[in-house]
């Protein structure tokens, strides 16, 4: 049964990584919509209104990321993964909470850490997914062979 949960864990990890790609797409769409506005009041106002669509998708998708991270953490128990891996999943959940708080601080310099924390979330999720991949063949680690003593010159 744990084998099925390991596969589910791998699938959820890939879904999380796909969600992160969407997050980056949505936020970039919002930023570049604003950045490409002409330097007049009407154009800037229109750009902000158009960027709202991307920002709203970024916020909604952020909630989906949170749900998947909670599922990822719960599945790590069901898959009977090592304690270290479960601990790293707990860290991932903690980083998500920090991510949510950073997005709502109201202090621009502090909220800027939101982007850096996102990179840490992406890296940790990629590590956990790759390290615990349940599909395909795993290559056994190289075994140490006892070397023969080198012949001595005569």
Give, region by region, the residue ranges found by the protein language model:
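Polytopic transmembrane helical bundles with strong interfacial aromatic enrichment
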Residues: 1-154
């Amino acid at each position: 049964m744990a084998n099925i949960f390991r596969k589910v864990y791998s699938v959820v990890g890939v879904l999380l990584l796909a969600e992160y790609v969407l997050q980056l797409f949505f936020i970039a769409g919002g930023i570049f919509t604003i950045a490409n506005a002409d330097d007049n009041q009407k154009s800037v106002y229109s750009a902000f209104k158009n960027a709202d669509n991307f920002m709203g998708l970024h916020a909604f998708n952020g909630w989906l990321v949170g749900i998947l991270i909670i599922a990822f953490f719960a599945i790590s128990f069901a898959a009977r993964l090592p304690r270290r891996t479960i601990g790293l999943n707990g860290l991932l959940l903690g980083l998500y909470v920090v991510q949510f708080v950073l997005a709502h601080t109201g202090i621009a310099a502090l909220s800027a850490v939101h982007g850096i924390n996102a990179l840490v979330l992406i890296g940790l999720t990629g590590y956990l997914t790759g390290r615990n991949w349940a599909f395909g063949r795993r290559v056994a680690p190289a075994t140490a062979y006892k070397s023969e003593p080198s012949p001595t010159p005569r």
